[in-house]
Amino acid sequence: MNRNRKRVMSLLLTAAMVASATTPILAEEEKKYEVTETEWGYYLVTQDSGETLIYSPNSGVTLLEDDGYAFKDLNQNGVLDTYEDWRLDTETRATALAEMMVADGRDGIESIAGLMLYSAHTAVSSETVSGTELDSRSGTQDGTTTMDAIMTNKLRHVLVTTVASAEIAAKWNNNLQEIVEGMEYGIPCNNSSDPRHEASTDSSVQYVAGESGDISQWPGTLGLAATYDPELVQEFGNIVAIEYRALGITTALSPQIDLASEPRWSRVSGTFGENTALTIDLSRAIVDGYQSTYDEDGNDLGWGDESINAMIKHWPSGGPEEGGRDAHYGYGKYAVYPGNNFDKQILNFTEGALNLDGATEMTSAVMPYYTISYNQDPSGDNVGNGFSNYMINELLRTEYEFDGVVCTDWMITADASSDSVFEGKCWGVEDLTIAERIYTCLMAGVDQFGGNNTIEPVMEAYDIMVELQGQEFADSRFAESTVRLLTNIFNVGLFENPYLDVDESVATVGNAEFMEAGYEAQLKSVVMLKNSNNVISAYDETAEKLTVYVACYTETTTDATTLVTTTTTTPSVSVEVLSQYYNVTTNPEEADFAIIGMESPSTGSGYSTEDLEAGGNGYVPISLQYREYTADTARETSIASDPGAEFIDSDTGEIVYTDEVENRSYQSKSVTASNEYMLDVLEETREAMGDKPVIVYMRQTKATVWSEVEPLADAIIVGYSISDQAAAEIIAGVTEPSGLLPIQQPANMETVEAQDEDVPMDMECYVDADGNTYDVAFGLNWSGVIDDERVATYGSEA
């Protein structure tokens, strides 16, 4: 399936009731619309050469007529207001509603404040809206339910996490939309989601040709990059958009298009890798896939009922984190630019998602990252990107002409008490109040606040703006954000069609066609790094089944109460899927070859409270190897630092601060991977197998130092968030591998320390026993090193 696919469904119902008694009623023969009651209790309004409408009889909204056409009286005033007229363009409608809201005084400003909120994470476990509290993501909940946020705080943007099923999600959406349709202005909810299409590693979840599933299963973002196929990535975007719409989701909090120039960063797996040319093309392709609707002939219609808003992240790239530490915590707040490479870091945005090939032209929303882009603001202001006038107003909006929604990353306006506690991320403005931070964001060009559920601090920020800038400025600034926020709701047609046909949703999400496309993409994403003596070759159905030994991991736990010890043994790759191709044994002596599944070395976040308590600065290395690593060649002095250093008072045990400049260096400190046992099991497997082949399946989330692993393996495949089923099909030779590395694999940790966080593809790469270099765009097929058009296009471009 691609852009020329047939339209699979018409997701959105539309409905209407009888015409408003305050509006002149046309004779039946003059009407250009027809009203039909649906089985779900809504009214469908179909029109001659006009928009299809829906609304609920329970919302209080009725129909207005003009020139024989029907319109929803969303504010229930009996007048066809400009924003209710679907014949007008989005800009006109959004501007008219924004002006109306401002004209309504403080009540209208409160509604605008509600639009500026983006809810905390919300699980949809039932079709009712009033249930579970919104998750504050800080270990506690603030008591706010979805209903509270909608009714009291006028919130219209809900971040949906887990959903019980497509049926439950569709019913929940309809109930939610019915509630807000009856409220002031009748503004629909624009629901969103973080990525939810990564393949399940649960061996019980398998692809079966011709069968449907919960949702289509694709490789992770780094796996999509490994295909080096923009057309496939655009197809992925198309399918995600259709499935999201069927779940009531109209904004994707994705794609994550940061340039993965720092190999230790924990979020590398969510990126398109570190090849600049490739990431530009894939960023453009996926956003085109999200935002454009196509007709049966493959023509790009622009915004339509198969479109979702893309919120690209994270401006101006979260990739160059110093030492690989992530900015969700204060110890990772700084992005650094030792290679003076800021301009290349933003190319994915400026030449990619902000410069689309499709009819929507530009991404509809941008999320700045938590990081302080250290010393990049000419004014010398070092604050988080969401607070930075330079990053948003001067660069994004003025220089690169982006006039869409800018939404902060989650919880940047909340308080933070320590670098090591998961709380707010108010980096650089810790001394301000929550309201002052919101004001700072608004003045910097932000429109919306991720993870904020209540309007009170936004209204306080409005009052601050009135006091400091004047009433006219404050009203104009709030109206400006309102137009942007409403534009994204109008563009996807929610004012006319916010409801779902539940049966259509169930039939659409995870349908057989989408499942097949996702599974094929998984297969295309697998990278074969090593294949000595053609251990992996084409599958021969007529040959006698080989016998495989599957390495296992053993875990022993002791119950703290009963002191009972339990030992659990888990196969490193699903025995169920491997048994489709091989006889499986637990005895290495009986096996023809062995398989071991491994995961990237996991060495933590780069910060240790134990080190802090022991008198250190808390900073430790992030390693890409399993065995102990000592950072002898790390920087003696960190590039970025806080004006005050944090330490533990030995008398009180409390965190205190000094006035001396902080040094975040971890030089000479050591760290060992928490999953070092995987290397132990590989060594044991190698010894047990003797000269018989050992195949390593690496589930990679970021780069690996292969010197510990490669010499012990006869063949290596790498998967990026794929199913064991897809990995097994490649190993068995049912499908020939075609993936290419999207990130470099370092020769050692010394080259990792020497590389610049902001410069992609600047490491010495690992060379294996067969003489192959594990660089970007390297991969093997059955014939050897892949050298095709993809390699010619992207192989040498950093």
Regions found by a protein language model. Name each.
Residues 1-11:
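Bacterial N-terminal signal peptides that target proteins for export
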Residues 15, 23, 566-568:
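N-terminal compositionally biased, intrinsically disordered segments and leader/signal-like regions
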Residues 11-13, 319:
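A periodicity- and composition-biased signal for non-globular, repetitive helical segments
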Residues 27-798:
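Glycoside hydrolase catalytic-domain context in secreted enzymes
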Residues 13-21, 534:
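Hydrophobic core
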Residues 19-29:
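Intrinsically disordered, low-complexity Ser/Thr/Pro-rich tracts
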